[in-house]
Amino acid sequence: MNFDIKWIILGIALVMYLLVIIFQEKKIWMTSVAALAVIVLGFLAQGGVLAGNVFEPLSGLAALAHHIFLELINWNILMIYVGSMIIAALFIYSRVPARIADALVTVSPSTGIAVILILAMTGIISIFVENVATVLVMAPIALALSKKLKLNPVPFMIGLALMSNLEGTATLVGDPPSMIFASYAHYSFNDFFVHQGNISIFFFIQAGMLVGCIFFYCFFRKAKEKASVDKETVISYLPLWLLLIMIGGLAVISFLTPELGYSSGCFVLGLGLLGLLWYRLSQKKSPAEVWQLVKELDWETIAFLIGIFVVVGA
């Protein structure tokens, strides 16, 4: 790669990240424009930006498209993300998380313990479910508990956000940053637990969650009242089983095929499509309702990830 081109690409990447930080609500535009700039430079440089000899068997736009769509963009990660989003949406629809939270509150000897259990559960769910969705599930429980016991809800909500964001980085399927990291560090699902014989990211994140639980317990320990909430009715446990199968399947696939191929993505996306089929047939949802669920998935992050893959790959 030409030395000057390297600096141009580095400058594009730095400006992109800076603008994403400043204008988070327009991050898709920032990454898309940066990716487009890199693609144009790649075409003009005829392989100088997009590394490798991919321009040998093909020429011009065909070679550029081949390299971008088959090498730079990590379709395995994208399929994992889409499939896990579908399963997460169905998991929330099932009301299982809310039911578990109700049970934790019921068995807690005091409000302080109940708060800690809710925060810990929020973190655990965020390990495998996108953190915004997790907070949307747990926030009503936290607000109802705060109102009933006349607690200030702000520290509780801050705790939910912190635990959710922290645990979102613990595994491959937790959050997009973990997926970007896994793509370029060549981490499999299991590598987040044990990497080259050493404990990995997951366990360090759990240490952080433990410290967070201790901190918030000190904050809420004076709340001695016995907490209670209205029990939720579970719609179905099938989404929970899909989630557990996804976790177990990813672990097995990572053990059998350490390299990041397409097997993990196809597996998770297949489970997600199976979940949609269950949602349509077993839950008797109309095509419009199924489409609404799909439409509400975080497609903006998919576009964001594609832009990141192109720019970082350059």
Where do the PLM segments sit?
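Hydrophobic alpha-helical transmembrane segments
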Residues: K6-G11, W29-V33, L78, G112-A120, ...
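Transmembrane alpha-helix interface/packing and boundary motifs in multi-pass membrane proteins
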Residues: L18-E25, M121-E130, A161-V173
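Membrane-helix interface "capping/anchor" motifs
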Residues: V20-M30, K147-P155, S282
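Juxtamembrane and boundary regions of transmembrane helices in multi-pass small-molecule transporters
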Residues: F23, L151-V154, I158, T169-V173, ...
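Membrane-interfacial helix-loop connectors
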Residues: V33, A37-N53, S59-G60, L70-E71, ...
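Membrane-embedded alpha-helical segments and adjacent helix-loop junctions characteristic
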Residues: L58-V154, E300, F304-A314
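Alpha-helical transmembrane segments
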Residues: I73-G83, S164, H195-G212, L260-L271
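Transmembrane helical segments that form the transport core of multi-pass membrane transport proteins
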Residues: I118, I245-A314
